[in-house]
From Swiss-Prot:
Lineage of origin: Eukaryota, Fungi, Dikarya, Ascomycota, Saccharomycotina
Renumbered ranges of motif Q motif: 41-69
InterPro entries named among the record's database cross-references: DEAD/DEAH_box_helicase_dom, Helicase_ATP-bd, Helicase_C-like, P-loop_NTPase, RNA-helicase_DEAD-box_CS, RNA_helicase_DEAD_Q_motif, SPB4-like_CTE
Catalytic activity, EC: 3.6.4.13
Protein name: ATP-dependent RNA helicase DBP4
The organism of origin for this protein: Candida glabrata (strain ATCC 2001 / BCRC 20586 / JCM 3761 / NBRC 0622 / NRRL Y-65 / CBS 138) (Yeast)
């Protein structure tokens, strides 16, 4: 029987016409909407589709915040948006609703490819955005995908070609752009940067530039954050020239960027007393939910392990960027569900994460700038709820208060009651003495903190030379300050760039023009035993730990009985033997080598010939008189720089085009290779049916006509087997097809002659 459709062809056509008319009406309402004069309160008052509105209602999003009211319709009207709003003000919905509406009005399908790209600086924030999108977009027909580090890349590669809305971190998105054959960004409609200031900073600069280079320039761009850099160069990198700035928070009317319901305070304490203050605070606030921020993951790990053994009386959790993704997700779930818990964390959860009912935000280490402080304290007092924050500053870091005052943030000063303060130094010393691995953690925590102070840019706040290293080491329970080797700022910046670049991207950068990666090492099968023997120690048996303790061991041990008096010294000429003739063939070959003889003749000079045949050096120095005849030195310098800048700008455009074409060519070749592999696999799968006996040759009878007859009969039988059977029901009286009459089984017509014979048979009945 024929499949019964829900609607007939006429009804489906009417439904399409209704939807087109509804979309036109919606677009007209958007263009007529006056953002300045219309102060809507509810989402239903906005010109958005019924499916999006239904998803918002089911997710309990009824009333709008200020940033949502001001930015959603502006984004719907097609403008680029540069949005700033306080933490916890609902910026996520401010860009998710325009994304859904844009694709709905464009009638986007899975065959149109990627329509919207949302970039988040952290994995946790990307996961939160994805969860909100799934809730409010439950009644739409779009496909959404989440690509973050720590997940299976092959699983994402198989599905990324059919995704309409892609959410992810910069590194993984760029990896898919270079590696995923089916990912096509040429038709992208919207680019969204959540926490845009973090995405635009030096850590993600090259990655983001590479992503933007793969996107079409006529897209719509939305930037949102609680604190944003207004650098013209940052905006120019995103092709953001004509944009609408919405929700400015640094004006005199709005006051500070922190929520009004947040009560802020600070404590001045010595560096050696910070852990004592923290432990005493936790002991006196056991029935609260708090987040404690540190500057490095090693500090988080050390404080978590030591406090866990001292059992302060509250559940302890820790979260940092060096953990596996599964452990990070499980920790977040536990913290979401718990009501009385303390989370030790780094800045991976400082931005955008919507933690429910956080009572306290503690900052043990001073943040690098006021923007980081704003994002940290923004984890409390969200959506109008009350919250409190505390920052612990050393006497050397009091200048940070002036930085906060410049942004209209004035926390109150707290004093510590001596009766509530408890020293934990003896307990830490005892724990580190009993457990060498815990001592190693303490040494790494000490080194990471000192390095974090060294790399800070604000030297008025972070004074590296005034650090009390010995007292700080004793406060951690260490017997002395470990030896620290700092390589320099260039090496640290290079390490940061490598940290933000995925290994897959580094390997893809070594690919040839055909898109193939040539590994020098032969690919061998590595068993679990090979991996076990190749594994390096990460505890007290590691090389890093031995290097730390080497200086202490050298000081403790006595002088050796036999010592080296001198090393790598020069011998006197009278002690050297007279060697006039080479003593071996190797020495003779070395003495007669062309390379060795050229080394004694000095550097060669390269000459070029002019039109008259005169030889000139490649680089000739101009005389002083000739130089002054051309004009002032500063003017010549400016003229030279302007010319070179124009040349570099022209070449930059052509280089980008060439680079883009090379990437597309690599993708095309990779896609062609995949197609050939699939065809070969398909041919191998069905080759057995055609061969009917493997590699066996059958000889004929000697008569060519008999062999041809057998071949034709085999072909006809094979066609008969493969041909389909069609049931035609024909009413002889009414000359119409019916379901209740006799059934005549025939073959499906393949040629015009078959079709004519079938028609004749049906007419004759």
């Amino acid at each position: 029987m024929a499949k019964k459709h829900r609607y007939t062809t006429v009804q489906r056509k009417q439904e399409r016409q209704k939807e087109e008319e509804y979309i036109k009406e919606l677009e007209q309402r958007i263009q007529d909407y006056d953002v300045k004069n219309n102060k809507a309160v509810f989402f239903k008052d906005l010109p958005i589709s019924k499916s999006t509105l239904k998803g918002l209602n089911e997710a309990s999003f009824i009333k709008m915040t200020d940033i949502q009211r001001d930015s959603i319709v502006t984004s719907l009207q097609g403008h680029d948006v540069f949005g700033t709003a306080k933490t916890g003000s609902g910026k996520t919905l401010a860009f998710l609703v325009p994304v859904l509406e844009k694709l709905y009005r464009e009638r986007w399908t899975e065959f149109d490819g990627l329509g919207a790209l949302i970039i988040s600086p952290t994995r946790e924030l990307a996961m939160q955005i994805y969860e909100v999108l799934v809730k409010i977009g439950s009644h739409t027909q779009f496909s959404a995908g989440l690509v973050i580090g720590g997940k299976d890349v092959n699983f994402e590669l198989e599905r990324i070609a059919k995704i309409n809305i892609l959410i992810g971190t910069p590194g993984r998105i760029l990896q898919h752009m270079d590696q995923a054959v089916g990912l096509n960004t040429s038709n992208l409609q919207m680019l969204v940067l959540d926490e845009a200031d973090r995405c635009l900073d030096m850590g993600f600069q090259k990655t983001l530039d590479a992503i933007v280079g793969n996107l079409p320039p006529d897209r719509q761009t939305l930037l949102f954050s609680a604190t944003q850099s207004q650098s013209i160069s940052d905006l120019a990198r995103l092709s953001l020239t004509d944009y609408k700035k919405i929700g400015t928070i640094d004006s005199s009317e709005d006051g500070p960027a922190t929520p009004k319901t947040l009560q802020q305070s600070y404590i001045i304490a010595d560096l050696a007393d910070k852990l004592d203050v923290l432990y005493s605070f936790i002991k006196s606030h056991l029935k609260t939910k708090m987040i404690v921020f540190f500057s490095s993951s090693k500090q988080v790990h050390f404080v978590y392990e030591t406090f866990r053994k001292m059992q302060p009386g509250i559940s302890l959790l820790h979260l940092h960027g060096r953990q596996k993704q599964r452990a990070r997700t499980e920790t977040l779930d536990k913290f979401f569900r718990a009501q009385q818990v303390c989370l030790f964390a780094t800045d991976v959860v400082a931005r955008g994460i919507d933690f429910p009912a956080v009572d306290w935000v503690i900052q043990v280490d001073c943040p690098e700038d006021v923007d980081t402080y704003i994002h940290r304290v923004g984890r409390a007092a969200r959506y109008g709820k009350k919250g409190r924050s505390l920052i612990i500053l050393t006497p050397q870091e009091e200048a940070f208060l002036t930085r906060m005052a410049a942004k209209k943030i004035e926390p109150g000063k707290l004093t510590i009651k001596q009766s509530k303060k408890k020293s934990i130094k003896p307990q830490l010393q005892s724990l580190l003495f009993k457990d060498p691995e815990l001592k190693y953690l303490g040494q790494k925590a000490f080194i990471s903190y000192v390095k974090s102070i060294y790399i800070q840019k604000d030297k008025e706040v972070f004074k590296f030379d005034e650090l009390p290293t010995e007292e700080f080491a004793n406060s951690l329970g260490l017997p002395g300050a470990p030896r620290i080797k700092i390589k320099g700022m260039k090496a640290i910046e290079q390490a940061k760039k490598l940290k933000n670049t995925s290994r897959s991207l580094l390997s893809l950068s070594k690919a040839n023009d055909d898109g193939e990666i040539n590994d020098k090492k032969d690919k061998q099968v590595r068993t679990k035993y090979d991996k076990m023997f190749e594994r390096k120690n990460q505890t007290i048996l590691s090389e890093h730990y031995l290097n730390i303790t080497k200086s202490q061991a050298q000081e403790d041990e006595d002088e050796d009985f036999i010592t080296v008096k001198r090393k790598d010294h020069e011998l006197k000429e009278e002690d050297l033997p007279q060697l006039t003739v080479p003593t071996s063939r190797r020495a003779q070959k070395k003495a007669l080598s062309k390379k060795a003889s050229l080394s004694t003749k000095g550097n060669a000079t390269k000459m070029v010939f002019d039109d008259e045949g005169q030889a000139h050096p490649v680089y000739e120095l101009e005389g002083e008189e000739e130089f002054h005849k051309k004009g002032d030195a500063e003017e010549q310098k400016k003229e030279f720089l302007s010319k070179e800048a124009e040349i570099m700008a022209d070449r930059d455009v052509s280089d980008k085009i060439i680079q883009k074409e090379k990437k597309q060519e690599k993708k095309r070749k990779r896609l062609e290779a995949m197609r050939r592999e699939m065809e070969a696999a398909y041919a191998d799968e069905y080759s057995d049916e055609d061969e009917e006996g493997g590699n066996v040759a059958y000889l004929g009878t000697g008569n060519l006509s008999d062999d041809m007859e057998e071949y034709s009969s085999d072909e006809e039988s094979r066609k008969t087997k493969k041909s389909k059977t069609v049931d035609y029901r024909f009413d002889k009286k009414n000359k119409t097809i019916s379901e209740d009459t006799d059934i005549m089984e025939i073959q499906e017509p393949e040629t015009i002659e078959d079709l004519e014979s079938l028609t004749a048979r049906l007419i004759e009945g």
